[in-house]
Amino acid sequence: MPISLNPSHSNTQTFKVAAVQAEPVWLDLQGGVEKTIRIINEAAAEGAKIIGFPEVFIPGYPWTPWANNFVDAQVVLKKYQANSMPLHSPEMDRIREAVKEADVNIVLGFSERDGSSLYIAQVTITSDGKIANHRRKIKPTHYEKTIFGDGSAQSIYNVVQTPYGRLGSLNCWEHIQPWLKTHFYSQYPQIFVGGWWPAFPPHTGGSPYIVSGEASSRMSQLVSMEGGLFGIVCCHVVSEAGARKMRMLGFPWFTFPGGGFSVIYGPDGAALTDPVDPGKEVVLYANISLDKIDDVKLVADIMGNYSRFDLFHTTVVNGKNWKPVAYGDPDEQAASKAQQAEIDNAGKGSIVPSKL
C-alpha cells in the first residue's frame, strides 16, 4: 500500500528532542511524579518538543529480584507494588496536565498497577495532554517475570502521529524481539524512544555482555539503523543511596553511582550526542530534521526497496499460533511438516532399551 507521511521525509524543519538520564525517586509514587514534571518543564524550557523517559521511571527499575532471593526481595517489592501508578489516576492526570502546559510530547515508562498486578508500561502523551498510546512490554525479561505480567496484544501497536513525525516506543529487550520489531517498522515510525533499565560496564562482576549498558545502547542503535529512524535512548542512574534502598548493594554486576548510557541516535546509527558520565543525571538534547531519514532510506529501506515480502513477512495471529514459521504455499507447508516429523523420529530405531 502506498505510504504518505506527514510530515514527510523531505521536511527540513529542525526541532529538538530530549533523552532523560536520571535517578528515579525510588519506591515513591508522589516523588516520582514530581520529578517527572520537573524534568518535563526543564526540557521544555530548553526547547525540546519530544522527551523520552527510561523504563519504569516511576517508581524505578527493580533490579532487586536479580540481586536477592524472593524472600529478601519481598519487602522491597511490596513497597514497589504500593508505589506503582495506575493508568487512570490523579498522578497520571497531573503528568498529562504538565505535558499540555509545557506543549511537548513525551514517552513515559512506568510500573503500571492494574488491581494488584504490575506491568512494564509506556504511555505516549501528546501536547494536548491526551494519552495517544498506552502499551505494556509484551514479555518481561528473566527475573522481571516474578513481578510483572505480559503485555496484551494491543501493545504491539506502538507508533502514533505527532506534529513532529510518527513517534514509537520500545522497552528494553523488546529491541531484540525480531517479529515485534518487524511489526513496529511496518507502522512507519520516524522517531522512537527506547526506554531502558540501569545497566553497567561489560562483564562487571562476571556479568554477561548482553546485560551491559554498552550492549543495551547497541540494541537501540541497531533499531535506528535497521528502521532508518531517530532513536532517543533513555536510562536510569543509580546512586549508592538508591542501591541501598533497592537492596542492590553487594551484587557483583553493579557499580555505584552508575547505570547510565543515554544517547540520541540518527537514522544512520550515528550518535548525535556526546558520551556522558554513567553516574550523572543529565538530559541530552539533539536538533533533528526528518529529511535525514531519506539519506538512509535511499540506500536501504527495509519496508520498501530493501525488502522481499514475497518471501518473508510477519503474520499477526492474535495469540492463536505458536509456530515461529508458517508457509503460505500448502505444498511447502506439507513438506515442512514432513521434514519436522523426520527430525522428531530420527534415531528412534537405534535406541537400545534399558535392561535395568
From Swiss-Prot:
Q: Can you tell me which residues form the catalytic site?
A: 55 (proton acceptor), 137, 172 (nucleophile)
Q: Where is the CN hydrolase domain?
A: 15-290
Tell whether Hydrolase is among the UniProt keywords.
yes
Record's InterPro entries?
C-N_Hydrolase (IPR003010), C-N_Hydrolase_sf (IPR036526), Nitrilase/CN_hydratase_CS (IPR000132), Nitrilases_CHs (IPR044149)
Matching entries from SUPFAM superfamilies are given as: Carbon-nitrogen hydrolase
Note the superkingdom of the native organism: Eukaryota
Q: A Gene Ontology MF term for this entry?
A: cyanide hydratase activity
- What reaction is this protein's catalytic activity? formamide = hydrogen cyanide + H2O
Which UniProt keyword terms apply here? Answer: Hydrolase, Lyase
Q: Does the keyword Plastid apply?
A: no
Q: What is its EC number?
A: 4.2.1.66
Annotated segments matching region Disordered: 331-356
Report the protein's function: Catalyzes the hydration of cyanide to formamide. Degradation of cyanide may be important for plant pathogenic fungi in infection of cyanogenic plants.
Query: What family, per the record?
Result: Belongs to the carbon-nitrogen hydrolase superfamily. Nitrilase family.
Q: What is this protein called?
A: Cyanide hydratase
Organism (species): Armillaria gallica (Bulbous honey fungus)
